[in-house]
Every structure is written in structure tokens, then in C-alpha cells.
UniProtKB/Swiss-Prot annotation:
Function of the molecule: May be a cell-type-specific regulator of pigment cell differentiation.
Name of the coding gene: HMX
Annotation: DNA-binding region: 253-312
Name of the featured protein: Homeobox protein Hmx
Taxonomic placement: Eukaryota, Metazoa, Echinodermata, Eleutherozoa, Echinozoa
UniProt-annotated stretches for the region Disordered: 1-118, 201-259, 383-405
Keyword Membrane found: no
Length: 405
């Protein structure tokens, strides 16, 4: 191409810096699938040196050495478009920065890839080692942004959000127009921008680091079970074991209830009425007569004594209640009778009753203050005193007869 321009007399044009960077990014171990062969008419012409300078110092041209095959186009689409090898190979899952197979310089080492390989080479296959190192350094610097300044910081552990964030940082670093449609991550976002970004970071059916196995546990890319899922599974088994342990004593404690016949119950009741407590010999003899064990007879007497104590307590309580009710009734009756007596005493009227007889003189003489019923006796007047006494007694009781004459 440069030789044809020299023959035509045109001044050679230097490719843009982006084209030059794209040429530098081509790795030597990946030759192009479309090598350009020089025409036969120009095969015998001598090649110019790799670098030459015209009158203008700003124009420089870089030609690859003759041993390396030359590619046809150096456009962005041809560089960024995946080759046939990458089309056939399956898309590798994005590597997390905390992966154990990631070294300190940003390269992945381990038996998965077989050799040292940059983690971003699968995402951008057309970039060289130097550009990938620079991009890895930029990504490491972007990872040191404080989580409080980032929107959607609660989605940092989401694999889809992680892949979207690093892809957006790569586009922002290279000035791609696809990233300019969204505001920078560190800048405050409006509601519409948040909704748009939420739609972009919605989970898609892509392969992630942790996948759910057939048993329902979380597994990483190597098939090992994550500690959280193992802990939950162990806790579930422990809880099931605890439930089994809790249910096992209940099953052991459950016993069959002994059913006694009517004759056995009658014999036991009659024995209990005679004696509340049995000795060991009496218990053994009763068990032998009833064809029961000593334990069954002992338990029956224990239950019967408990029932008897409950009955006695109930009877005593009912007797106490009846006695208390009787006492209250008597107290109420006494109170009512006292009230009635007091009311009757208040209604009573005292009326003086005079006793009148057919002897008004005697009655008048009794009420006269000058006549005494018993005059003072004097010596020599015994007959007079006796006569006065007899007259007084006859006045009080007319039917009585006088003894002294």
C-alpha cells in the first residue's frame, strides 16, 4: 500500500494514533488469518527502512519487518471483532478480583488456563499485553473508590453488576460512546438515570461464579460447595437430629394402659376399703390371687389413694363451705331479730294499770300517808298488833282466813 502511494507520487499519510496503537496491540503469537501478499510487479523493488522522516517531522510511518505477515485492514471493527478461534471457543466466565487463581500483577495462574493469561484478554481479544496491563491498573484504581460514593453499592456482590461495572469502566477509559449515555459512577444520579442503570444491570442468563448444583447447594466454578451453603446444610441436619431426639423420648415414655376386669376391680376395691396401705407380703398374695404383677397392684393402690385423697379434700371443702354458709345464715337471722326487737320496743306504750276492789275504805286507807301497814309494836300490845295484822291481810285477800283470834 505504501509502495503504491510512492509510485503514484502522493505523499504518504501517517495512520492515526489509534491505528498505531492497534498495530502495537497485535500479539505476535496470533497471526492474522488474512495475510496480504505484495503484487508481483513490486516484489523486486527494494524495501524502505522501517522508519523514515519527511520534511514534516510530525508524519512518521511504521512498516512491519518483512518476516512478519501484514494484515489487510486496521480499522476498529477488524481489531475489536472476535476471530474465528474466539467464535468457536466458549465464552469464559468473568473472573472476580478476589479469585484465588489471580496473582498480584493481575494475571491469572492455575491449571484452568494452562499458562499465564491476562484476565481481560477474553473480554477484549484484540488488545496486547501492554494495553491490558494499563487497563488492569486503571481497573484496580477504580476499585479503590469508597463504597459509600457508589450508587447501587448493595449490588456489589452481584456477578452481573460486577461484569457491567468493569465493562463500563473499560468503555469510559477508551472513550467509547456507549458509556457516555450514562453518567459516571461516582457522580450523583437522578431518578431517571437510576432507573436506566437498574434496567442495564438486571441479571441476564449468563454463567456466574456460584451455581446451584443438583442438590440445591451453592458451588463455585471448580465445583466445590461454598461455606455458607455447607453451614446451612449442616444446620438443617442438626435441627433434624434435634427434632428426632425430642420425639424419641416421647415415643419411649408412651406405655400401654393395663385394663382390669370387673372381678379384679371389685377385689381391689374391697381390699382398699379394709386397708389403705399394703405390706409387701399382702401385695404379693393379692397379686397372685388376681393373676397380676406386684407392680400393677402397687400402681393401682397408689392411684386409688390419690383418688381417695382428692375425694376427701372435695368433701372437706364442701363441708367447710356449708358450715360457713350456716354461720352466715345464723348471723343474718340474729341481726334481723335484733332489728325487729328494737323496732317493737320503740312501738311499745307504757300504760299504768290500777287494781280496784270492792273495799274502797281499805284501798283509801292503804293509799293514805298516815296509816302504815305495819305499825311499830309496843310492849303489852301484842293482841292489838295481831289484830291489826289480821285485818290488813284480810283486806288484801278476802278469801284468806285469819289464824290468830
Amino acid at each position: 500500500m505504501d509502495s503504491s502511494r510512492e509510485l503514484s507520487g502522493e505523499e504518504p499519510r501517517s495512520p492515526s494514533p489509534r491505528h498505531e496503537t492497534s498495530k502495537m496491540r497485535l500479539s505476535p503469537d496470533r497471526p492474522s488469518h488474512h495475510p496480504a501478499r505484495p503484487p508481483a510487479s513490486l516484489a523486486s523493488q527494494p524495501l524502505r527502512p522501517a522508519h523514515y522522516q519527511d520534511d514534516d517531522d510530525s508524519y512518521r510511518t511504521h512498516t512491519p519487518p518483512p518476516s512478519q505477515p501484514r494484515t489487510k485492514g486496521f480499522s476498529i471493527e477488524s481489531i475489536l471483532s472476535p476471530t474465528d478461534k474466539h467464535r468457536k471457543s466458549p465464552r469464559s466466565p468473568p473472573m472476580s478480583p478476589s479469585s484465588p487463581s489471580m496473582s498480584s500483577n493481575g494475571y491469572s495462574e492455575g491449571p484452568i488456563y494452562g499458562s499465564t493469561r491476562h484476565p481481560l484478554s477474553a473480554t477484549v481479544p484484540g488488545l496486547g499485553r501492554a494495553a491490558l496491563d494499563e487497563l488492569a491498573a486503571h481497573r484496580a484504581a477504580a476499585l479503590h473508590i469508597p463504597s459509600a460514593a457508589l450508587p447501587f453499592s448493595h449490588l456489589a456482590h452481584n456477578p452481573a453488576f460486577y461484569a457491567w461495572m468493569h465493562g463500563a469502566s473499560f468503555l469510559h477509559y477508551h472513550g467509547m460512546p456507549a458509556f457516555n449515555s450514562h453518567p459516571p459512577i461516582a457522580q450523583p444520579l437522578t431518578n431517571s438515570s437510576r432507573l436506566a442503570m437498574a434496567k442495564d444491570i438486571s441479571p441476564r442468563p449468563t454463567q456466574s461464579h456460584s451455581s446451584f448444583g443438583e442438590e440445591g447447594g451453592e458451588k463455585d466454578s471448580r465445583g466445590r460447595e461454598s461455606p455458607d451453603s455447607e453451614h446451612r446444610r449442616n444446620n438443617g441436619h442438626e435441627e433434624d437430629d434435634d427434632d428426632d431426639d425430642d420425639q424419641s423420648p416421647q415415643k419411649k415414655k408412651k406405655k400401654t394402659r393395663t385394663v382390669f376386669s370387673r372381678s379384679q376391680v371389685f377385689q381391689l376395691e374391697s381390699t382398699f376399703e379394709v386397708k389403705r396401705y399394703l405390706s409387701s407380703s399382702e401385695r404379693a398374695g393379692l397379686a397372685a390371687n388376681l393373676h397380676l404383677t406386684e407392680t400393677q397392684v402397687k400402681i393401682w393402690f397408689q392411684n386409688r389413694r390419690n383418688k381417695w385423697k382428692r375425694q376427701m379434700a372435695a368433701e372437706l371443702e364442701s363441708a367447710n363451705l356449708a358450715h360457713a354458709a350456716q354461720i352466715r345464715a345464723q348471723a343474718n337471722l340474729a341481726q334481723v331479730s335484733a332489728v325487729h326487737v328494737h323496732a317493737y320496743a320503740q312501738r311499745m306504750v307504757r300504760v299504768p294499770i290500777l287494781y280496784h276492789e270492792n273495799h274502797p275504805t281499805t284501798g283509801s286507807s292503804l293509799h293514805s300517808p298516815n296509816i302504815l301497814p305495819f305499825p311499830m309494836p309496843y310492849p303489852g300490845s301484842y293482841h292489838q298488833i295481831s289484830s291489826s295484822t289480821s285485818s290488813t291481810s284480810s283486806a288484801r285477800s278476802p278469801t284468806s282466813t285469819s289464824i290468830v283470834t
